[in-house]
Every structure is written in structure tokens, then in C-alpha cells.
């Protein structure tokens, strides 16, 4: 088995792809003509987005929608960078909301937390040495 995708269910797939492309520099890989699913080239694991309407057809018992008006889910997308301060501010300029400022952890790694335009938690960090 291989971990292949992280799929976030979002209000607007096209806006979310545009946000992540602007915030991270990732390129769009694919999107459906209907705009209900799309993928970004983000490294070894594909970062994908599907519409809330598609989620409703996939999950007959319902699902929890992410929202900026609620606390973030207990899961995050983590992106490593050697230019954390620059990339953290780039994401904010693209529309991310700062959740926790960049700090240096006791083990030497720098870490900061953001929320994306849908309320999902993003960690921007330096690689662990």
C-alpha cells in the first residue's frame, strides 16, 4: 500500500486551488470541468480538493465541514521549507490566517501555523535535521 492523496472537501475547488498555488507555488495538475475536484503537484503525495457537494454523495452518514468560524480539526497539512519566514508571509499575503507565529522548537526546528481559506490547519516548518 502507498499513501497517495490527501483530499480536502471545500466550498469552492477553483478558489482553493488558486489559494494554494499562490501561497505555496504548487502547480495545478488536474481539475474536472465541473469544478468539483482538482489536484496540485505538491511532491510525492498529491494534494487534492473535492467539493462539499461531492462529499455529500460520498458519505451517506454526513461529514464535518471545515470552517474558519470553528476551531480547526485535529489534523494539519505540513509543508517544509528552508525559507520559513518568507514562505509564511507569502501564505498570509495569499489569504491564509495566522494561527500561531513562527517559533523555534527546543529541537531546533522552526514551526508556524496558519489556517487556509476553508479553515484547514497548515503547518509551515523547516525540515527536522
What do these predicted regions represent?
Residues 10-12, 106:
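Conserved beta-strand-loop-alpha-helix junction that forms the acyl-donor binding cleft
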Residues 1-5, 27-82, 88-115, 126-129:
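Vicinal oxygen chelate
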Residues 117-123:
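Short, contiguous alpha-helical
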Residues 13, 84-85:
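Residues at or immediately preceding the N-termini of alpha-helices
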Residues 16, 20-21, 91, 119:
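Conserved active-site tyrosine of GNAT-family acetyltransferases
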